Amino acid sequence: MYICVIFKKQLNNSEEILLKNPYKHNGTITSTVLKKTSSKFTKKAYIESYGCQMNFSDSEVVASILSSNDYEITSKPEDASLILLNTCSIRDKAEQRIRKRLNDFNHLKKNDSKIKIGVLGCMAERVKHKFLEEEKIVDIVVGPDSYKDLPNLIEKAKNNIEAVNVILSKNETYGDISPIRINSNKISAFVSITRGCDNMCTFCVVPFTRGRERSRDPNSIINEIYSLEKKGFKELTLLGQNVDSYLWYGGGLKKDFSNASDLQKKTSITFDKLLKLIAETFPKMRIRFSTSNPQDMTTEVIKIMMLYENICKHIHLPFQSGSNRILKKMNRLYTREEYITLIKKIRKLIPDCGISHDIITGFPSENEKDHEDTLSLMEYVKYDFGYMFAYSERPGTLASRKYEDNVSLTIKKRRLTEIINLQQKHSHIRMKSFIGKTICVLVEKNSKKSDLKWSGRTTQNTVVVFEKKNFKVGDFVDVKIKDCTSGTLLGDAISYSKSI
């Protein structure tokens, strides 16, 4: 057993506090140095986030950096002297929405010229000149690997100096930053474990906006989870563009692992080892992870999920298309048959595992047979839920350079409707299978439709709504399921649960 001891004393602004890590690895106890944050906030900042869970996690890192520089995070943009939008580039619709919000915020700026507006995240590289120089609708542009430079960029903007940093890093993971949970329910939290991606799917901008794949030091991951546990959090989601390819060998890009020393290779930590470590270190904490790429998910990970109750029985496993021809054009490095084999393995080892998906319909040259292949794969798996989109060509991606976007919008919409309708049918089938069963639910928040009811999730990531009674947010409750919709289970609370 290793004991965490924190020595406290009165700190001056220039001093630092040293936190000893309770996790010992390879015979050494690591330490994280955190700057003391001021107890007096002199400025206010507003952060608005779009897109994937990673963006929302990044916004919590940004909030921490700003807090260390005397900014209070506010939920009201009209109260802020600094307005930041953490942006998403995955679809054109998201970019259009962000542009609209920038115009809204510039109306605020007309009444107060001291307000500074910044764009963060995946849009930064592509729009830096357009938004900053041509349209002049932002003052600051910051890429995903440059958030530590924000205080410097803010000062530049105040002095009318170009404030841009979109440089991608080979080693930045923000492992030394303690995130501020600005959008949290104080029960569930995101914990980033990897950044970037090496897969180069032809439809995706992530490798160009977030850089090459690198993994975070497991010591800093354990430290962050330890802090969450002490604050009363009950659930965490391990985040990465591709969590299953997590690989720690002392730091550096995953692609450089072949050049590592024999000792580094021997002591390296893969995702299954990290998952086991976290499950054993925090047995009372629910653990989720997202997202998995089918080509990288191993049998070892599935077995670890099977062995530990606190690892949630849900896998988000995007397949994008059921057609081998389209998968190849997408540069997805698995076949339909290999994907089905993986599904069979999951069902065999974890029969009650919830499985969700991502699907892109209308990819260049997709024909009716390709579409039918997608529908037939859905019929085979019968997913619990999924995220379904029509293909949106993104500038700078390999697909935009190699393929003509030649599937009409009408056909895309029709195919998407068919996919959504089929998924709703399958979701209802999965939901009805819970009726009559008593299942453990983590209470998260009020139901959207009634303040007299709680909303929470099962281990399969299924939403459950039930009467509040004497239970509270953060409780694990056994709920007997009475009815359902295609998206929600409805039940009666029985008692506090002995499970998680």
Q: PLM features: residue spans?
A:
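Proteins enriched for Cys/Gly/acidic motifs involved in redox and nucleic-acid/cofactor modification
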Residues: C4-Y246, T270, E337-K348, E372, ...
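Terminal RNA-binding accessory module
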Residues: V5-L19, L34, A399-I500
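Conserved SAM/AdoMet-binding glycine-rich loop
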Residues: I117-G121, R126, K230-E368, E379
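Glycine-centered loop/turn positions within well-structured domains
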Residues: K148, N199, D244, Q295, ...
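Short flexible coil/turn linkers enriched for glycine and charged/polar residues
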Residues: N183-I187, C197-N199, I311, S321, ...
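Conserved, mostly hydrophobic/aromatic
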Residues: C201, I221, L238, F289, ...
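Active-site proximal loops enriched in glycine and acidic residues that flank catalytic Cys/His/Asp
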Residues: G240, T291-N293, F319-S321, H357-T361, ...
